[in-house]
């Protein structure tokens, strides 16, 4: 019987499970949707009960899909960095003013806590050095402060505040252990010192969490992949269709699991892994850009971190990101007048809207006699529709489009789609430049996630950044990264680095363009930067008007 591990990944819209053998070969996967409520603009809520139900169904379905039922020795969980609120009995506590306890999760992308974030950032606290100088409203301490101020009844009822990955391991094991990954990256826990910053929490208005001995936010903190307690409980095993006692690894945030799935893959050009030259790009609803340093911590304005041991023990992690990438591309395409017709045509042909758009771009390039990328010479997009996470770290920024025509045909949609994808790629270039300015020498991007299944997205990122882009052999790299956690917890590998070496492998690579096309992207990148400067100038003009 094949020994196997399970990776569970809870993204923004679905819960997925993957079964892998200990060489990283995928045996089966399954996915189940999860529900989301959006009661106000820039708010997003979910249900932890709904999420756990979807996780259990996905694991059961994946196990049933295996050609031969394997011997599962470990399971790892990753999820979005959403905030879960429970009472002392483990029941959901509402995060919504309407009072529905089923809605007890503030989703990672929710920006309701902007006022709290601005107040915290104005304090200039020392801990902010370890989040790029400024907190994001997507982090947990502003959300906790919002909950305390706006829903005091929920605050009083709450006994547990979990990051979603840690909620999953709690459901699996009954242990309230928190992951070093989640606490360091999203909760301002100082991983390099192994402590909470009491003065910071007290100063911003969360001193009661300190007085309670951190009972509600985590006093048992574990390294990623470390085994939790006695493994799967009898009840969790019954729900998941597995055997009690299976090893459960301490969890990770979903993007960081993707980093585990790609950043350490062996490359033929080098016998060793030079992390200073590698960036892991995890492209989905949003995008995350992970780099690690063996040297002293690198403080990069507008880039989260440096986070100690948040992905690999002993290494410092810096994390750039874009709050909306796949979500932005979907928004632009789905809001166009031709979207309904294109969706119907895709259904009729048995393909996707994006494949049809890519086909249209190929036709347009053929007519023009030039490469696809040059079709957007007069059309430019600033992609900050949901603010800018990195490197400007300003959630108040907004997007822009320059070069629109009085047209709503398929060609118009295809060009707007291409310009948006390119804008996302220029955002990645901006982040890479900020990282390289502080000591990194990034020339290779290891990419995974839903966006990396699109060849237009991949080519745009290679050409815009000038980096070689490497894809993993296993396309479900986030699931594989989570499975590595389960393998390490089960003792199949001594540590995460060994698990990465044994289970992750490189696939094909894409080299960046040079010559005329490189100069074209340099020019468009200059426009990208100027679009932001222009937005700031417009704001100043309006502010002067009173």
Briefly describe each language-model feature range.
Residues 103, 182-189:
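Glycine-rich phosphate-binding loop of ATP-grasp-fold ATP-dependent ligases
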Residues 63-141:
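Active-site phosphate-binding/coordination module
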Residues 6-7, 118-132, 145-177, 186-203, ...:
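Active-site core segments that coordinate phosphate-bearing ligands/cofactors
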Residues 17-19, 24, 75, 110, ...:
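Conserved small-residue
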Residues 1-95, 157, 238-250, 408, ...:
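N-terminal glycine/serine-rich phosphate-binding loop of ATP-dependent small-molecule kinases
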């Amino acid at each position: 019987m094949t020994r196997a591990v399970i990776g569970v990944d809870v993204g923004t819209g679905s819960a997925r499970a993957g079964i892998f053998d200990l060489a990283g070969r995928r045996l089966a996967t399954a996915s189940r949707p999860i529900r989301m409520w959006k009661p106000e603009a820039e708010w997003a809520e979910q249900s932890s009960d709904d999420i756990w139900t979807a996780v259990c169904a996905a694991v059961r379905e994946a196990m049933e899909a295996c050609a031969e039922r394997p011997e599962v020795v470990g399971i790892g969980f990753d999820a979005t960095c959403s905030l879960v609120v429970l009472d002392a009995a483990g029941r959901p506590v509402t995060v919504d003013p309407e009072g529905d306890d089923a809605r007890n999760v503030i989703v990672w992308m929710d920006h309701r806590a902007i006022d709290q974030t601005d107040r915290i950032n104005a304090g200039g606290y020392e801990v902010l050095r370890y989040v790029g100088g400024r907190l994001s409203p997507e982090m947990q301490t502003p959300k906790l402060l919002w909950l305390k101020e706006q829903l005091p009844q929920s605050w009083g009822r709450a006994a547990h505040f979990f990051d979603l990955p840690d909620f999953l391991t709690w459901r699996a094991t009954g242990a309230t252990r928190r992951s070093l990954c989640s606490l360091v990256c999203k909760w301002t826990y100082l991983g390099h010192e192994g402590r909470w910053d009491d003065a910071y929490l007290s100063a911003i208005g969360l001193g009661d969490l300190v007085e309670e001995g951190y009972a509600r936010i985590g006093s048992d903190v574990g390294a990623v992949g470390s085994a939790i307690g006695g493994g799967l409980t009898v009840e969790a095993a019954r729900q998941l269709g597995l055997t009690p006692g299976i090893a459960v690894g301490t969890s990770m945030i979903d993007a960081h699991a993707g980093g585990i799935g790609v950043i350490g893959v062996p490359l033929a050009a080098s016998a060793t892994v030079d992390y200073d030259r590698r960036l892991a790009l995890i492209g989905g609803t949003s995008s995350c850009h992970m780099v690690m340093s063996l040297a002293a911590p690198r403080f990069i304005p507008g880039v989260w971190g440096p986070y100690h041991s948040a992905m690999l023990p002993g290494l410092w992690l810096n994390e750039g990101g874009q709050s909306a990438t796949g979500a932005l591309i979907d928004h632009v395409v789905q809001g166009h007048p031709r979207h309904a017709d294109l969706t119907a045509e895709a259904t009729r042909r048995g393909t996707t809207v994006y494949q049809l758009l890519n086909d249209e771009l190929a036709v347009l390039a053929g007519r023009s006699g030039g490469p696809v990328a040059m079709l957007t010479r007069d059309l430019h997009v600033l992609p900050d529709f949901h603010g800018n996470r990195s490197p400007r770290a300003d959630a108040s920024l907004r997007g822009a489009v320059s070069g629109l025509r009085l047209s709503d045909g398929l060609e118009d949609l295809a060009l707007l789609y291409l310009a948006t994808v390119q804008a996302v790629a220029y955002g990645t270039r901006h982040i890479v430049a900020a990282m390289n300015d502080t000591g990194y020498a990034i020339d290779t991007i290891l990419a995974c996630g839903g966006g990396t299944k699109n060849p237009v997205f991949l080519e745009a990122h290679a050409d815009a950044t000038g980096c070689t882009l490497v894809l993993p052999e296993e396309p479900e790299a986030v699931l594989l990264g989570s499975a590595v956690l389960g393998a390490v917890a089960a003792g199949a590998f001594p540590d995460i680095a060994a698990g990465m070496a044994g289970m992750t492998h490189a696939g094909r690579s894409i080299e960046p363009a040079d010559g005329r096309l490189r100069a074209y992207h340099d020019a468009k990148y200059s426009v990208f930067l100027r679009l932001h400067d222009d937005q700031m100038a417009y704001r100043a003009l309006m502010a002067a008007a009173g």
